[in-house]
Amino acid sequence: MKLIYTEMSYSMTEILVNEARKAADQGYRVFYIAPNSLSFEKEREVLTLLPERGTFSIIVTRFVQMSRYFTVESSPSKQHLDDTTLAMIFYRALMQLKPEDLPSYGRLQNNSVFIEQLVELYKELKNAQLSVHDLTGLDHPQKQEDLIKIIELAETIMIQQDYNQDSPLQSFARAIKLGLLNNQLSKTVIVIDGFSRFSAEEDYLLSLLNNNCQEVIIGSYVSQKAYQKSFIKGNIYEASLHFLQDLAQKYHIKPVFATSNQVFKPAFSRLTQLFEATHDFSQVDWQLQKNDLDHFSLWQCHHQKEEIEHVAKSIRQKLYEGYRYKDILVLLGDMDAYQLQIGPIFDKFEIPYYLGKAEPMAAHPLVQFIESLERSQRYNWRREDILNMLKSGLFGCFDDSDIDRFEEYTQFADIKGFTKFSKPFTINSSRQYPLDFLNEMRQDIVLPLQELFKSQKQLGASLIDKLILFLEKIRLAENMQGLAQSQLEVEKNEEVWKRFTDILTSFHHIFGQEKLRLSDCLALIKTGMKSAQYRVVPATLDVVTIKSYDLVQPHSKPFVYAIGLTQSHFPKQIHHSGLLSDQERARINEIRNYRHFDIASAENSKKNHQTALSLFNAATKELVLSVPTVINETFDDLSPYLKELINFGLPLLDKGKNYLSYDNSDIGNYKALLSQIIAINRQDLIEMSDQDKMFWTVVLRYLRKQLRKQQLELPTSDYRLSTKPLSKEVIEVCFPKGIPLKLSATALTVFYNNQYNYFLKYVLNLNKTESIHPDSRIHGQYLHRVFERLMKDHTQEPFDNKLKQAIYHTNQESFFQQVYQDNAEAEYSLAILEDIVRSTAPILQLNQNIKVIDQEKNFHLDMGNEILVHGIIDRIDQLSDGSLGIVDYKSSANQFDIGTFYNGLSPQLVTYLAALKQIAPHDINQLFGAMYLHLQDPKLDLVTFKQIDNTLVESIYKALTYKGIFSEVEKEHLSTGAYQTKNALYSNDELETLLNYNKYLYLKAAKHIKKGHFLINPYTSDGKTVQGDQLKAITRFEADLDMAQARRLVTLPAKEKKECFLTLMRKESRL
């Protein structure tokens, strides 16, 4: 064995490549070993350093891959064990054990997290060269007993199913020990680069290779100053020193110092020496030179998005200077926090990148499909799960519009559960759903699922056969091929499909002869899919590489950007959270001889120093270290390592917000520039200098010119929220000339509530989602129907009998039967409605001097100027003197307020008076009023009554009164009825004023509607809060930001309120 160390200013790779070349020139076969995470990049670096740029004598690979070169022909043809297969084996083992067999873990038998921890422990045991019987000294002896039972049973299953329990390194080591590879290894040289420690498995293999190979050469970075130190605790080279010292002591070799021809910039070397002096308690009498600072930058940004955008701009600048994407490396302090953001931002700046991390399959449509399938079976055809299966795009041949229509109907009819999905859809609504089409679609969905879900407990092989048959029926494979929109997506789908078929194969192999329920089968496949990962190789090498900063090696790229280096992530603190604690691992590690657990937490300090050292020397030209103030919406501090750099004299640059300028980094990329222009166009103006304003004025003028050529535009507005007028063509279609504009009292109220709401409801005809479950609208229809029947009954039957008959016949109507007899909740609603009817009906019995002229009367009121107002009057009453009035049933409390009417928010009663005047063309003297009747079951607080007497009954009837507008002329006739006339009496002239102003409201609204420009202007009564419909989900209206756009209502003092509003009405209606 040969041990080599060198300073950070030299290239260890060049030194080891020279050693490899010498061995290759002598006829030896050379394996150049790199860590798993660096083998691809190391191969490119090694081949670059070779004069011939390639050779068959030097193979750059990993330990595991090297073992396959030697054992590929002699290895037994057994099944391969991966994490998913291991999890299935442990699940099968736990199935065969009873809870009482496992005192410590019996309650966790079906826990997926516990099974994952078992898999991790089993892999750790293999890497540590330990068996489950070596787990002595645990905190609780029963833990070892349980683990022995579980793992031994799992290993028995592996033997039965012909799985290879040995890892590739174990198989390689066994072949070496048996002497099967002596001839090959005698002609082999092993070169090892990039390691600072070996696992127990690698350590054992290395001892065998050292005895059988021609030579083993290992290199590591250690400074000569550190190598000569006797006390190395806390030294930045502590990990490498321990690594070399252990090997030197074990193999009785003295490490040799070497140098390379390539010497990196002295700025990095001087920074390293300062860093080393800080941690070995020595002194230096110099500082970084001014020109050294040109190679380092410390950035501070407010949050991650700004940080990534600054990096993207800097990368674009490097390209402008002539460098290539492959010269740039981006390191992330927290992969999970940055992974979702960095992709879209780099795409915006048109920067191709490769993320050096396996992607989880959990977000792929195939995994979502399998998860929805499993949940559909487990939760008995829950609607959300069935729809998620369809929306994955992998079930059957359905268009998006078909799926939307199916979803709309199932929500309306509340279809959930197998019983409802299995029956034909028969319920319809006013929207007239295409039931024939929906039933055909229902059958295409239900039949294959029903065939699969009716599977009873049976052999796993039979379940897999039925599952595959189901997947063939729904054309899963064909649909999977149709998902991809690009070559990259094709490659991703191929990798996902391969993992899926591997999981099915493993399940068939392990559980083929075991009896299982379908739910267990689907749950196992789902778990395997959700935990699986895949990796896609970039289509070109000229990309920006992105990876975690703790995987970096010295001198990786010319330009390195390390971002997210906050105190929480730099340095990283790693802790085990498995079935064994670190204390238990330490006790087990007392057994040596190549057998030991890796305890990451015990090596945090020296590993973090080694990582920081590699990071500070990762670049060969320029290193940028960046830290956000806020990461994952949490404030974080500077890393202690960055604070050391600041003490060395490196300035911390506050990058601030991404204000646009005319620097190359801001305007050098068209796509990024356009996106920033749009972003600025949506926000408040920022302060600019005169020079900036002039520049951006010219740029905007040029951009608009280019956008016009592409038929695009940048919208401008004086308000944060604005709307565009409808085009002339649309106005002509929506409001054709010669055809009256149809309005109603409800439509007018909506218009004056918020014009944009009118546009959505009556121009676009958007409606809320319907439901078969009764709501306030259906409740109102029921009450109307009962009272309509009751008032039509002119027989001599007692009133109570009439009421019972009206309720009975209304309940027998098919529509109300479907609505109110669907479930217990609907039946309860019906019982409450019947109570309301019985409570309200006596008011009709008391007013015997009233004659009902008509009910549910349709009317069309001509307002002039091509405006036609339509509606339905619930009831027209006639007093004994022949005067007519209108009753409008309400399921909630309503009362006419002249101020609300003036502001256009309560035109219903006055509109009905105008309609009645047109229907019965008599003068105003023959109208006694228009009123609301609140259909209710009055609630009284009995605490306020001293005794149960007539006052209680009077209070009930007081709540059951007509409230609205009444003619002062009919005051005497109204006094004997249940009419609340206080502050509600109007003279004939005042009634005429109300009618005239009502017409003015319609004309004013119609004029605005026909212009086709609808404002977002919900009303406010006080200028502080908004009471109108804000439609936040659509308009993004915010009261604190958009109060200026709200319509302020006219309000007047309560004193003389009626007279003042009538004066305003006369004035405005005459204009």
UniProtKB/Swiss-Prot annotation:
EC identifiers of the protein: 3.1.-.-
Top-level division of the source organism's lineage: Bacteria
UniProt keyword annotations, A-Z: ATP-binding, DNA damage, DNA repair, DNA-binding, Exonuclease, Helicase, Hydrolase, Nuclease, Nucleotide-binding
Top EC group: hydrolase
GO molecular function: 5'-3' exonuclease activity; ATP binding; double-stranded DNA binding; helicase activity; hydrolase activity, acting on acid anhydrides
Gene Ontology terms: biological process: double-strand break repair via homologous recombination
Leader peptide range in chain numbering: none
InterPro entries xref list: ADDB_N, DNA_helicase_suRexB, P-loop_NTPase, PDDEXK-like_dom_sf, PDDEXK_AddAB-type, Restrct_endonuc-II-like
A Pfam family per the record: ADDB_N
Record note on quaternary structure: Heterodimer of AddA and RexB.
Function, as annotated: The heterodimer acts as both an ATP-dependent DNA helicase and an ATP-dependent, dual-direction single-stranded exonuclease. Recognizes the chi site generating a DNA molecule suitable for the initiation of homologous recombination. This subunit has 5' -> 3' nuclease activity but not helicase activity.
Family matches, as NCBIfam families: rexB_recomb (TIGR02774)
Family designation: Belongs to the helicase family. AddB/RexB type 2 subfamily.
UniProt xrefs under PANTHER family: RECBCD ENZYME SUBUNIT RECC
Protein name stated in the entry: ATP-dependent helicase/deoxyribonuclease subunit B
Organism: Streptococcus pyogenes serotype M12 (strain MGAS9429)
